[in-house]
Amino acid sequence: MKQTSKRKITNIFDVIFKPFDNYGSPIPGMSWHKISYNKTNGGQGTYLLKMEPGAKSLPHLHTGFEEFLMLEGELIDPDGKIFKIGDFVTFEPGTSHSSHTKDGCLVLVFMRGINE
């Protein structure tokens, strides 16, 4: 039987990262590789996010669910919560936050809505 589905395989250790510009201008110290993320389809999809040591994300509001899996390093939210390797984190719609990293991190992000 002929396979009719489309398949895409991404090796996370063999990708090219580009400056993270999801909010317009690139954010210093942040880069990404879009796996299936597409802002024009309502912000649905998956991407790899790489943050260099000392990088900080912009404060943002989640209009849909954002979930991520920590692959490398640590990520810190303003309330002091530290996300570590292996943590799977869910932010529900209506949640706002920003994050930073001391030593850098790699995160696999699953989006179900555009951040504001």
Please report, for each region that a protein language model flagged, where it lies by residue.
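A short, N-terminal "cap"/entry segment at the start of jelly-roll beta-barrel domains
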Residues: 1-43
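Conserved short histidine dyad/triad with adjacent acidic residue
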Residues: 31-62, 92-96
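Glycine- and acidic-residue-biased ligand/ion/polar-headgroup-sensing regions
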Residues: 53, 62-78
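Short glycine/proline-enriched turns and hinge-like loops at secondary-structure junctions
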Residues: 43-44, 61-63, 81-82, 101-103
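Short acidic-glycine-tyrosine-enriched beta hairpin
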Residues: 77-97
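Ligand-binding loop in jelly-roll beta-barrel domains
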Residues: 93-116
